[in-house]
């Protein structure tokens, strides 16, 4: 439903933003884009976003931390993919890098790579070639050093 510019008020924009945020966490950029697609004027959108930030309903750092925890711990993604996904969701590059670096200290990448391998290649797949494990980890966004350490460890453990 597109808003008519002559009918748009601070209240209507704020109500639309509340509806967006009620469904799930969003970055500032995502809320801006969704309100813009609904046809609200830029000035009203900016006023709304400022108000949401003042109220604490819109906080890119908090959202980035939450998303990063999910990506690294639950989805077993590497830092490269997590950082890329944060930026795609409207988190600024510097903030994305900072949040991912902090999360990495709590949850080392080698642990995430081990979990990813264990989840993808169970005991039934002992004959998985090393190249396949390497490619899988790289597709999950793990850096080269972690990929090769985890893949070598996986290879050693399946033989031994």
Where are these regions (language model features)?
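An alpha-helical, amphipathic repeat domain used for nucleic-acid recognition
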Residues: 1-160
């Amino acid at each position: 439903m597109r808003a008519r510019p002559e009918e748009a008020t601070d209240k209507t924009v704020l109500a639309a933003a509340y509806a967006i945020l009620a469904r799930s966490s969003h970055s500032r950029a995502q809320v801006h884009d969704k309100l813009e697609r609904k046809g609200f004027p830029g000035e009203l959108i900016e006023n709304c976003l400022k108000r949401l930030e003042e109220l604490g309903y819109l906080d890119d750092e908090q959202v980035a931390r939450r998303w990063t925890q999910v990506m690294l711990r639950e989805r077993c993604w590497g830092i490269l993919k997590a950082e890329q996904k944060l930026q795609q969701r409207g988190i600024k590059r510097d903030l994305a890098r900072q949040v991912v670096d902090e999360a990495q200290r709590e949850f080392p990448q080698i642990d995430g790579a081990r979990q990813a391998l264990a989840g993808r290649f169970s005991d039934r797949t002992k004959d998985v070639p090393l190249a396949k494990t390497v490619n899988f980890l790289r597709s999950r966004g793990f850096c080269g050093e972690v990929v090769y350490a985890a893949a070598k460890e996986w290879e050693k453990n399946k033989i031994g």
